[in-house]
């Protein structure tokens, strides 16, 4: 065990205490204690100008802002099966992660693998958000198949980050919420997103890897009610 700030614990050990809901010696903060390094696959999910690896074109129209998608190439249910999605097996895709992971002290640092844009985001970027919602009513099977194809790539990326780079945590990000509500109904989320989101989680759990899930917006409706009820949480926290 290496010391940090005179304590008999190092940043990695302290971080993992917090993740396991034990009492850390200090509040983990990677900006302060360098406890976390994030590695990313090399699949181009976004760019300032030009086309990403999924066939979506981007432009940065205001230099003080991020780039925005300017086309959504998938415009017909007939395109879903044969649309050329990127191959995650190319050596270029993982080269960035290899280089970063090889330069850190795994005894002192938690290694987090960033899976990239989530199932909802990546799917609506391919087709446009209005079309996503229209298809959820008119062409639900085509939408499910497209999400499935995206998820298959994301699963391969997760498996590679776990088995080849030995990450401790996989980070998934998908913006499901707006300022005051969900972007899609809870029923739609459970129908189209949840089945494959669960498979992404299962890949991590099968390898004893922790999951970090990010979402912008107000998404409390996804969280089972006992976890939002302070009295019940206090009463049953050990069982939860």
Features from the language model and the residues they span:
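Ligand-binding pocket scaffold of soluble enzyme catalytic domains
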Residues: 55
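Active-site loop segments of alpha/beta catalytic cores
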Residues: 1-34, 60, 84-240
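Short acidic, Pro/Gly- and aromatic-enriched capping/linker segments at domain boundaries
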Residues: 35, 39-50
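Short, surface-exposed, low-complexity cationic segments
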Residues: 61-83
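Cofactor-binding catalytic cores of oxidoreductases
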Residues: 31, 52, 73
